[in-house]
């Protein structure tokens, strides 16, 4: 503010001076020798007194007087009185030609106010304790808990040692908090909200913020968050930090030690050796990477400590990407041995299954040698390497299924009217699931149970409850159920159970459903109210099953049911697909198969 | 009896050695022994090669890919070693195995060898041995085997009976609809080649359905390969069928949703134009082309821009000028400000090629503004390309008219920070000199050329000494004495030995464009001085220079002028100097 008005003052002064130029030049100026001093107002040059002082003392006296202070006066020394008068007339113009300074790129003003010490202490407490709820509450109320918008760096949570939130959380071993912080500060929407600017602006800042979080040494021992995690044996934190390629593992602290050097130094548990080993693996471990060129189908194995960059050889071929990773291995030799056995094993499988053959072989080998295994699943829409055997990997899958189901729900709402009209034309490809079609008492019973008011009401409900019998679209199953009259009823109901919520053993409803006002389960099991419209059965890549479903199922089927039961939609998916025989599943064609695409086009 | 046994043992020896070597741990040893395979076969004779060596190779085919690759290649040339066409089929089994391995390079080599030996088969043995193998490959469980099969149809088809022909057709059609994209890709790549060996009348019935299948494939990598196949079909079919069956497919590919496919279309644009051009509505084709020029993907615009001139040249003459001025140039004007530098560079390289096609008047009114705009572009590569097409402008309007606007651009490039850019403009100088005339050159460009002689990058100094020769040839020796020799004299006295060496290099090239009198008068005094330079590098380069310059002198002058200098250098304290002076003496016969 001060600077702006000063500039304005200068301009005004120039105008003033110009209009009075002749008068000024005629005014006799006291020509005294020696230095003179003037006092002037920083804020408004026009308010400045036009007095000349002979000594510092005199001018200082004025500046310190009440009048001087009221205009926040400064003083300046000049060689001659004329220079002093000129200064008062046009500011600094005669000595240094004063132009309007180039407009510095204006920094955006964050819509959020700064965080004070007390608030920061509260924040620190939550980070330390791993109190995710309160952590998120604070960050949501003011993102500046995380980012210092002044320099696009991490906010300092603890003065003195200048710890940022990662330092604190790493020391305390709060893995989840760290993962959340890293996720937030790399989230474009979060940053846009924080800065109040656009995506291009924050993308640049993001790099700086991330680097500042991961690689800033503290003020005491020059430890980075990775040093802390390693020192205190917080293996989960070490893993999260090293997974981020922006983390510099080679930084040294004041004692000249890298994060690896101080592994477990302050760890006191009995399993110190194990912890040190794990930290070593996470920081220095070797990985075997499987690269795939999706165009030519060629594959390549490499061994390295860091994921290699993706590359493209020509515009007509797609980018070669890492599609799976095994490791970390303790030594490069172990990794090379693994790569070698991966290269030689399973030749048959690798030549039969073109897009998952190598992965299937590698997965088994990794299990045998107890190496960690991650691979990409393209249907998820990202190149992220996932371990579906871990909670984190399953979490990603669960989120995907939830999103997919939500999308299906929306679509079915939108298309409901049109499907009503076209349903009869669609013939066997979309038969309405009416259990009356099936002969046999059992299914009739079920049908009655479901609509206790009788068949009339079932008809009334028709419009709301439309089911598509996807089995007619599973070639093998459809063939059997339609053409094979000897198919037992038990098997039929089983098959239908696989896809409908009328299943005799319905999977527990996913929690978010029970919260949703659309689906009311409160009436309990005894109530025979018409169940809500079931979203069409979800296959991961398409409305109908394809090879991807089989590939995914094979992996999920190996996971302990205990772990999978934490992910209801995934569990649901596994249960449904598990009802089918391996043979049925193996007939599912790749999603881009011409035969499959043709039949879809006809529909 | 014992004699016979002994002979057998002797004959077995090479195989025993081979087996030993093939079991060696060291891959390079195994590679070496596989490379010697033909020698071993020769030693064994045809019968034993067939019965033992080939048998052995078939059984022990599991090795590193490098070894397999060499093996696959060798077997393709084995026909004479197994006893010629009558027995060539014994090579099929090992090659069939190699055609199914995981490594693409090995498979491709095996297919190449199989194609080679297919020609060596008689028709009968082709049906008896080759076709069953092809059948096995094409219907195998492994996608690697099916992929390899695709490449073998075209060598078999022309030589088999109609019954087998129709079987092959249906096999190929099945491969075009394979579940594995890699197989479909191989089929799409070979479709055009296969169509070419068809009887003309049978192409439509036999393969058109496969083309239509492949061009709507889900995988863009498959669709992009059908561009070439469709072009091949186009050249085979008669007008009516081409219009009815091929044109719609190509038109769809122009609008494909994947930019990789559109890129391929742009790459093959001229071939497409040749196939469709004569029968298709020109406006429609031009519209499709301008769409490529406006494509959202930079790579596509680049590829399309590259073909601007050729496309225009191929247009029917009566409509050409109209189309260029009304359609193509309108789009080109947008490309001048394209966000992608590469697109602008391509445009700068081709745009002036349109000048001869549209005549002087249109060039001045339409092309010149584009030219000027590109000349002032921020990217050096763009300016370089546009200056390089100066000769084309010259043909139409005379470059002299442009000299005032060219100069700043040339000077800018001459001082560009990237040495490759400077190098390009250095090499372009002789052409500029001839286009713009001596007067302009002497006044404006010569100072630049002389400056380059002292550039801090060696390549620039070297290139500028080379152009001095061309310039001297163009403007004459007298020109060199007045313009270049003074600079040489200056360099000769430079404190930096590198500059003194540049001086020598320049004299080398100059001497080739000057008369003997001029050499004696202008060049030799400078060399004489440098022979006594303090730095050995300069002295031995002086020896080298004498060798080159001496080639342009008569024997008598050599003896009188050059020999004493070389003898002096021959007594130098530095080994290298003595060496090069000796070399110069020898090559000049002194």
Curated annotation (Swiss-Prot), chain A:
One of its GO terms (biological process) is negative regulation of phosphorylation. The chain crosses the membrane at residues 2-22. It is found in: Nucleus membrane. GO terms for cellular component: endoplasmic reticulum; nuclear envelope; nuclear membrane. It is a single-pass membrane protein. ANK repeats lie at residues 161-190, 221-250. Its main location: nucleus. Residues 446-465, 505-538 are annotated as: Disordered. Residues 456-465 have a biased composition (Acidic residues). Changing residue 229 to V: In ax475 mutant; temperature-sensitive mutant. No visible phenotype at 16 degrees Celsius. At 25 degrees Celsius embryos die early during development due to defects in nuclear envelope reassembly. GO terms for molecular function: protein kinase inhibitor activity; protein phosphatase 2A binding. Keywords: ANK repeat, Cell cycle, Cell division, Membrane, Mitosis, Nucleus, Repeat, Transmembrane, Transmembrane helix. Involved in mitotic nuclear envelope reassembly by promoting dephosphorylation of baf-1 during mitotic exit. Coordinates the control of baf-1 dephosphorylation by inhibiting VRK1 kinase and promoting dephosphorylation of baf-1 by protein phosphatase 2A (PP2A), thereby facilitating nuclear envelope assembly. It is unclear whether it acts as a real PP2A regulatory subunit or whether it is involved in recruitment of the PP2A complex. Belongs to the ANKLE2 family. Interacts with baf-1. Interacts with protein phosphatase 2A (PP2A) components. This is Ankyrin repeat and LEM domain-containing protein 2 homolog. It comes from Caenorhabditis elegans.
From Swiss-Prot, chain B:
The keyword DNA damage does not apply. Transmembrane segments: none annotated. Coiled coil: none annotated. Keywords: Cytoplasm, Cytoskeleton, Repeat. HEAT repeats lie at residues 37-73, 74-111, 113-150, 151-188, 189-227, 228-266, 267-305, 306-344, 349-387, 388-426, 427-465, 466-504, 505-543, 544-582. It is found in: Cytoplasm, Cytoskeleton, Microtubule organizing center, Centrosome; Cytoplasm, Cytoskeleton, Spindle. Belongs to the phosphatase 2A regulatory subunit A family. Acts as a scaffolding protein for phosphatase let-92 and its regulatory subunits. Probably together with let-92 and regulatory subunit sur-6, regulates centriole duplication, microtubule outgrowth and mitotic spindle stability during early embryonic cell division by preventing the degradation of sas-5 and kinase zyg-1. During vulva development, may play a role with phosphatase let-92 and regulatory subunit sur-6 in the induction of vulva cell precursors by positively regulating let-60/Ras-MAP kinase signaling, probably by promoting lin-45 activation. PANTHER family: PROTEIN PHOSPHATASE 2 (FORMERLY 2A), REGULATORY SUBUNIT A, BETA ISOFORM-RELATED, SERINE/THREONINE-PROTEIN PHOSPHATASE PP2A 65 KDA REGULATORY SUBUNIT. This is Probable serine/threonine-protein phosphatase PP2A regulatory subunit. It comes from Caenorhabditis elegans.
């Amino acid at each position: 503010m001060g600077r702006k008005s000063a500039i304005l003052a200068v301009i005004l002064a120039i105008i003033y001076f110009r209009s009075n130029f002749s008068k000024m030049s005629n005014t006799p100026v006291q020509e005294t020798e020696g230095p003179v001093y003037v006092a002037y107002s920083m804020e408004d040059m026009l308010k400045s007194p036009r007095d000349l002082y002979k000594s510092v003392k005199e001018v200082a006296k004025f500046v310190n007087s009440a009048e001087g202070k009221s205009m926040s006066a400064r003083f300046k020394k000049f060689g001659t009185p004329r220079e002093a008068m000129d200064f008062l007339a046009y500011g600094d113009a005669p000595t240094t030609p004063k132009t309007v300074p180039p407009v510095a790129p204006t920094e955006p003003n964050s819509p959020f106010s700064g965080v004070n010490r007390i608030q920061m202490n509260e924040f620190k407490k939550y980070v330390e304790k791993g109190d995710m709820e309160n952590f998120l509450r604070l960050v949501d109320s003011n993102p500046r808990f995380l980012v210092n918008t002044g320099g696009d760096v991490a906010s300092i949570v603890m003065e003195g040692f200048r710890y940022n939130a990662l330092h604190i959380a790493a020391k305390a071993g709060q893995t989840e908090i760290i993962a959340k912080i890293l996720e937030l500060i790399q989230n474009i929407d979060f940053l846009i909200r924080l800065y109040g600017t656009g995506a291009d602006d924050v993308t640049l800042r993001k790099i700086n913020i991330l680097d500042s979080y991961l690689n800033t040494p503290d003020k005491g021992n020059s430890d980075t968050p990775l040093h802390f995690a390693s020192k205190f044996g917080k293996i989960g934190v070490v893993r999260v930090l090293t997974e981020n390629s922006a983390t510099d593992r080679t930084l040294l602290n004041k004692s000249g030690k890298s994060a690896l050097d101080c592994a477990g130094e302050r760890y006191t548990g009995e399993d110190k050796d194990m912890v040190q080993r794990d930290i070593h693996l996470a920081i220095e471990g070797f990985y075997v990477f499987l690269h795939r060129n999706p165009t030519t189908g060629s594959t390549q194995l490499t061994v390295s400590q860091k994921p290699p960059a993706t590359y493209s050889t020509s515009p007509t071929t797609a980018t070669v990407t890492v599609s799976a990773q095994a490791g970390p291995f303790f030594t490069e030799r172990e990794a090379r041995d693994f790569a070698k056995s991966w290269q030689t094993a399973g030749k048959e499988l690798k030549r039969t299954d073109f897009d998952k053959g190598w992965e299937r072989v590698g997965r088994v080998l990794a299990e045998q040698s107890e190496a960690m295994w991650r691979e990409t699943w393209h249907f998820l829409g990202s190149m992220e390497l996932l371990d579906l055997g871990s909670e984190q990997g399953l979490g990603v899958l669960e989120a995907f299924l939830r999103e997919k189901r939500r999308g299906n729900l929306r679509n079915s709402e939108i298309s409901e009217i049109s499907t009503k009209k076209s349903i009869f034309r669609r013939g066997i490809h979309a038969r309405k699931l009416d259990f009356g079609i099936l002969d046999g008492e059992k299914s009739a019973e079920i049908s009655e149970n479901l609509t206790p008011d009788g068949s009339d009401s079932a008809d009334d409900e028709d419009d709301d409850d439309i089911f598509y019998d996807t089995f007619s679209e599973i070639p093998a199953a459809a063939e059997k159920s339609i053409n094979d009259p000897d198919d037992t009823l038990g098997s039929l109901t089983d098959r239908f159970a696989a896809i409908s919520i009328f299943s005799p053993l319905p999977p527990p409803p996913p929690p978010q459903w029970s919260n949703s006002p659309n689906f009311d389960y409160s009436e309990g099991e005894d109530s025979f109210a018409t169940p809500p419209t079931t979203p069409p059965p979800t296959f991961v890549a398409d409305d109908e099953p394809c090879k991807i479903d089989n590939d995914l199922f094979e992996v999920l089927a190996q996971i302990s049911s205990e772990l999978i039961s934490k992910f209801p939609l995934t569990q649901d998916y596994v249960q449904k697909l598990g009802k089918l025989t391996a043979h049925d599943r193996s007939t599912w064609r790749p999603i881009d198969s011409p035969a499959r695409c043709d039949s879809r086009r006809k529909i | 009896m014992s004699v016979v046994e002994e002979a057998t043992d002797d004959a077995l020896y090479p195989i025993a050695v081979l087996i030993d070597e093939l079991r060696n741990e060291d891959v390079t040893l195994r590679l070496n022994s596989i490379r010697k395979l033909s020698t071993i076969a020769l030693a064994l004779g045809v019968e034993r090669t067939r019965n033992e060596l080939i048998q052995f190779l078939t059984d022990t085919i599991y090795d590193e890919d490098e070894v397999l690759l060499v093996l696959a290649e060798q077997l393709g040339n084995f026909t004479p070693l197994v006893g010629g066409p009558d027995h060539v089929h014994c090579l099929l089994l090992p090659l069939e195995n190699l055609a199914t391995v995981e490594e693409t390079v090995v498979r491709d080599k095996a297919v190449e060898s199989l194609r080679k030996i297919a020609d060596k088969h008689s028709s009968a043995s082709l049906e008896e041995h080759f076709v069953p193998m092809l059948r096995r490959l094409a219907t195998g469980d492994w996608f690697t085997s099916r992929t390899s099969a695709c490449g073998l149809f075209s060598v078999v088809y022309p030589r088999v009976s109609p019954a087998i022909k129709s079987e092959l057709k249906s096999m190929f059609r099945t491969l075009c609809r394979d579940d594995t994209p890699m197989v479909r890709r191989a089929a799409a790549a070979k479709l055009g080649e296969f169509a070419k060996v068809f009887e003309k009348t049978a192409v439509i019935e036999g393969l058109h359905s496969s083309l239509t299948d492949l061009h709507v494939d889900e995988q863009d990598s498959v669709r992009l390969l059908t561009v070439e196949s469709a072009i091949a079909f186009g050249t085979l079919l008669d007008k009516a069928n081409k219009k009815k069956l091929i044109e719609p497919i190509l038109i769809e590919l122009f609008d494909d949703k994947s930019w990789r496919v559109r890129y391929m279309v742009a790459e093959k644009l001229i071939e497409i134009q040749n196939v469709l051009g004569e029968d298709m509505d020109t406006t429609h084709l031009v519209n499709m082309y301008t769409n490529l020029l406006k494509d959202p993907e930079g790579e596509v615009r680049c590829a399309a821009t590259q073909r601007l001139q050729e496309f225009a040249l191929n247009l029917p003459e009566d409509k050409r000028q109209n189309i260029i001025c009304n359609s193509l140039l309108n789009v080109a004007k947008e490309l001048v400000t394209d966000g992608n530098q590469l697109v602008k560079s391509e445009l700068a390289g081709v745009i002036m090629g349109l000048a001869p096609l549209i005549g002087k008047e249109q060039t001045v009114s339409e092309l010149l503004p584009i030219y000027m705009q590109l000349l002032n572009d921020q990217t050096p590569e763009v300016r370089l390309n546009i200056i390089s097409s100066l000769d084309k402008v010259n043909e139409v309007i005379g470059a002299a008219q442009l000299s005032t606007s060219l100069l700043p651009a040339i000077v800018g490039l001459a001082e560009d920070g990237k040495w490759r850019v400077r190098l390009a403009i250095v090499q372009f100088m002789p052409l500029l000199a001839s286009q713009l005339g001596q007067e302009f050159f002497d006044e404006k460009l010569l100072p630049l050329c002389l400056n380059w002689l002292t550039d801090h990058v060696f390549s620039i100094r070297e290139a500028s000494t080379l152009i001095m020769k061309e310039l001297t040839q163009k403007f004459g020796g007298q020109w060199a004495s007045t313009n270049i020799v003074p600079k040489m004299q200056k360099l000769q006295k430079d404190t930096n030995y590198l500059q003194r060496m540049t001086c020598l290099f320049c004299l080398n090239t100059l001497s080739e464009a000057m008369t003997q009198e001029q050499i004696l008068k202008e060049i030799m005094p400078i060399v004489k001085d440098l022979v006594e330079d303090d730095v050995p590098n300069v002295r031995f380069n002086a020896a080298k220079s004498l060798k080159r310059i001496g080639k342009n002198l008569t024997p008598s002058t050599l003896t009188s002028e050059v020999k004493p200098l070389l003898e002096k250098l021959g007594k130098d304290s530095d080994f290298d100097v003595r060496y090069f002076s000796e070399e110069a003496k020898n090559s000049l016969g002194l």
